[in-house]
UniProtKB/Swiss-Prot annotation:
Mg(2+) binds at D63, D102, E134. The keyword Ribonucleoprotein does not apply. Pathway: Cofactor biosynthesis; (R)-pantothenate biosynthesis; (R)-pantoate from 3-methyl-2-oxobutanoate: step 1/2. GO terms for biological process: pantothenate biosynthetic process. It is found in: Cytoplasm. The lineage of its organism: Bacteria, Bacillati, Actinomycetota, Actinomycetes, Mycobacteriales. Belongs to the PanB family. The keyword Magnesium applies. The active site is at E200 (proton acceptor). It catalyses: 3-methyl-2-oxobutanoate + (6R)-5,10-methylene-5,6,7,8-tetrahydrofolate + H2O = 2-dehydropantoate + (6S)-5,6,7,8-tetrahydrofolate. Homodecamer; pentamer of dimers. One of its GO terms (molecular function) is 3-methyl-2-oxobutanoate hydroxymethyltransferase activity. This is 3-methyl-2-oxobutanoate hydroxymethyltransferase. Its main location: cytoplasm.
Amino acid sequence: MTATSGTSSSTPTGYLVPTKKVRIADLKARKGTGEPFAMLTAYDYSTAVAFAEAGVEIMLVGDSAANVVFGYDATQRISMDEMVYLTAAVVRGAGNAAVVADLPFGTYEASDEQAVKAASEMLHRTGAHAVKIEGGVRIADRIRAITDAGISVCAHIGFTPQSVNQLGGFKVQGRGAGAEQLLADARAVQEAGADMVVLEMVPADVAASVTKELDIPTIGIGAGPDCDGQVLVWHDMAAFPAGGHRPRFAKQWASVGSDLTAAAAAYKREVAEGGFPTQEHCF
């Protein structure tokens, strides 16, 4: 939020933070204002606190936790219980930020009833403000059922990690003839009642066209600068762990991995050499 919006204030650290609860409707109202918003993933209380203090307005508890938290080889492996534990922790630390939670693979695809039950469980057990589900035309009926139940939905089209095997790997979506399908997916999720939509690994010009076409906000991840918001996995933007693979679309603003490793090594060395603890650390 801008300093002139009347809904943010400067903290002692100089960051602009929301002074009231950010609602999904608030972010929808930013559509077309030229004021993009930043979303980051978060998976625990302490990280959520840090991002709230930085003024991040919306956090995503993504099923990317399967990879970066639990060490699974695919997002399809994470369970509802695992997502619930992480999301509840993030909500407790998120301050005024809105929190969106991924519905895990296999919890919403089979039927409208299954989708509504999963979305309701996620919000009831965690306090999250919206759920995110992957897919366009093929999943529009599930989005409609969830929104008809009074639950906000963030859709996710383009590259959808839960469908990585069907898509043939980590590939850019929406090139050539695929642009028409992407636009059809975008229209379908909007018509089904989605409040916003993530565009992942989509050519920038295609994402710009989709953003212009839709009345709901688009959130880009590897989708160029013209989306209404941007999202990154925080491990990618902060280089954690050190030496890990970083997608081309992610910029690094810190080196958390190398700093943490260096701190752990220094601690180990001082303990081994008798340099810690000293008198100042004793009662």
